[in-house]
Amino acid sequence: ESIKQIGVVSPLIVRPDPEGGFEILSGHRRLHAAQLAGLETVPVIVKEMDDDAAIIFMVDSNLQRENILPSERAFSYKMKLEAMKHQGERSDLQPETTSRQLGEKLQTSVAVMSEEMGESQRQIQRFIRLTNLIPEILDMVDEKKIAFNPAVELSYLKPSEQKEFLEAMDYAQASHYLS
């Protein structure tokens, strides 16, 4: 309703799309609201950035939302970490990287993320662990049916073991109602 009356106050952030037009980096919801309000134009800021920088920008924008699900935070942290690991690399010039070098780069990236996000390195790594959960269990975390700490522990199980856990939980719930 306010968008209908005064328009979009905060500009969308976009970058040029190589195939023509623009890619929205921040402001998808504002654009949708503007379209629903019948607006034909919205203010934008055009930024030049490569794919990794765009991913980091989008993730940072999403993480600033107030109501973000644990799964959204988990995948956002994982995406940002992957993009940070790629930044500044030229794959055509890179020699074979050792697992030790990869581990050091990962720790450096997590430390930088920790500073930027105001979240401990351990907590960031624990959120990223949630991306190893099967979708059914991850949904239960988002719905607050499984708490964060037990979910992190479940993430260390193989997908088949997670399914067995889920079946055991369903059975226990069903037998509880039968008694």
Where are these regions (language model features)?
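Short, charged/polar connector segments at secondary-structure boundaries
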Residues: 1-47, 53-67
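Alpha-helical elements of the RecA-like P-loop NTPase motor core of helicases
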Residues: 32, 135, 163
